[in-house]
UniProtKB/Swiss-Prot annotation:
This is 3-hydroxyanthranilate 3,4-dioxygenase. Its main location: cytoplasm. The keyword Acyltransferase does not apply. CDD domains: cupin_HAO. Catalyzes the oxidative ring opening of 3-hydroxyanthranilate to 2-amino-3-carboxymuconate semialdehyde, which spontaneously cyclizes to quinolinate. SUPFAM superfamilies: RmlC-like cupins. The gene is haao. One of its GO terms (molecular function) is ferrous iron binding.
Amino acid sequence: MLPPININKWIEENKSLLQPPVGAKLLYTDIDSTFVVMIVGGPNQRTDYHVNETDEFFYQFKGDMILKIVDKDGSFRDINIREGETFILPGNTPHSPQRYRDTIGLVIEKKRSSENIDKLLWFCDNKDCRKLLFSRSFHVDDLDLGKQLTPIINEFYGNEENRTCKHCNHISQKPTVNDYIQ
């Protein structure tokens, strides 16, 4: 059993690791647990929507964030999670965490079984369209989710065909860090 971790000290010592595009680092790496505990820093550069079959717990440690979601009825909405607030996201809810510069959050997810499949989805960013552009399913086989997301994010942005909407012909562009600064 590991000793307790001083989160403030851990953040100070590991701040340089909380970098775009995902900015997530595991808080615990040497334990066999049911949970994956991550510290996530901003800004991020994500426009994807992640789908995890299990619930996710968010605690906004420093600064505010926006959790963009797609409801069961297909409508898009934003959930504001302010500094000091927590939120539990139900499993199978497409979500896109939007973190701004100098923000830090804690995210707890259930460790995936061999049957659990995650997805990354991108929707047309033309607000009058919002059709699905691109998706990838994958099994989280490494506790470091950020390591697995980055190649898929790069695959999406690396090919204009992936970013071109077949319904309205809009081409989604890769965001810059400045797009996520308040």
